[in-house]
């Protein structure tokens, strides 16, 4: 494992530090500043009863994370990558469509509008108020402008806050989520990093928090250039358990919801394989023996996500910094993907 010098922090990580330093403040401002547009989207959702969430990269992970939250309110929500929607489209008629793109300029966003023209129930979610997406569709616009650093950090937190505004307009109580944003968790990640010191691959997994697991896997692989991927808890159980062992790190997300016991069972099984297991835990349950557990305030939904996310971000950054000298500076990708 490559360790970077203590007196030098890669430029790319310095850029991420700047984004993260203001992400919670920007998230609260985003919630406060988008109430009226959120009400318009909520009205559309009540009328259609369906929600098609479209995005790419970290935006798709956000969509996957909020998908169950809308379903819990009786809205038939489905998150699909824009690339899949372009090639094998679901009907947009009779559905509210919400397209998420932090830059508002990705290639798939431009092509989707060029080919479909959108609909009267098509909305956007972006960090850039002058972007193509913001000019083309009514948008929720996050505070703070475009995220400049590679790997999504602030853009995730702000996007979740914009969804909190929509969920609040649908009748959900945002108080706990906002309270967590105002006082972010500061868990020590040292034990988790030590547990993963010798892993060659990481798999992240959750049940209701699967979208958060997918966001972490993406960030881990972008920054560390180590193979990191995500499997929903049931999918991990059905066959891929065969890959687990001392060289495969497992990260699980457990919230205070009806799926918590299933995540617990997976933690027990993963420990039995000899794999190092880190659990981000907002369930209020006892830690599973043999795991490295980071405990958070008992919560579910966006409150759980807001609790865990900044700590998970610090974990992925430190994991990457220990492995590559220029973590945070992409060598094969760009911040805004303008090609398909």
Predicted segments — roles?
Residues 18, 22-25, 32, 64, ...:
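A broad, structural surface signal
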Residues 2-16, 137, 269-340:
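Phosphate-moiety recognition in structured ligand-binding domains
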Residues 12-49, 139-249, 259-260, 323-340:
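Active-site phosphate/pyrophosphate-binding segments
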Residues 46-188, 241, 246-298, 306:
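Glycine-rich phosphate-binding loops that contact phosphosugars or nucleotide phosphates
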Residues 68, 218, 313-317:
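Short, residue-level hotspots on alpha-helical faces of the histone-fold
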